């Protein structure tokens, strides 16, 4: 069974777009505008991150074992994804995980 990447692709494009907008306005003197744009970047990052790990979990469940993703933490999930060559750099994904946790609180 093939996985549908459309939602992930859309969330990554939205994140890239919001980052580009942030960089084009980051020197603006309207701090409320910068804060609002920054919040949009954070929200788009959170969405892309959530879509990413859920897709990784689905792939592992479909290709390794039906409950693989349910037996581990997200960090463990990223380690498994590295073992199966779904991601190149496990460390950066753990950093994404930590960043996601920091944006939530």
Task: Briefly describe each language-model feature range.
Residues 1-105:
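Solvent-exposed interaction patches of small proteins and small membrane subunits
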């Amino acid at each position: 069974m093939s996985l549908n990447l459309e939602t992930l692709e859309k969330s990554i494009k939205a994140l890239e777009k919001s980052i580009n907008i942030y960089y084009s306005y980051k020197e603006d003197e309207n701090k409320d505008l910068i804060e609002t744009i920054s919040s949009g970047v954070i929200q788009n990052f959170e969405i892309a991150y959530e879509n990413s790990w859920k897709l990784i979990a689905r792939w592992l469940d479909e290709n390794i074992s039906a409950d693989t993703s349910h037996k581990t933490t997200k960090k463990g999930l990223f380690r498994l994804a590295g073992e199966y060559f779904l991601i190149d750099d496990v460390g950066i994904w753990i950093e994404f995980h930590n960043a996601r946790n920091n944006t939530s609180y």
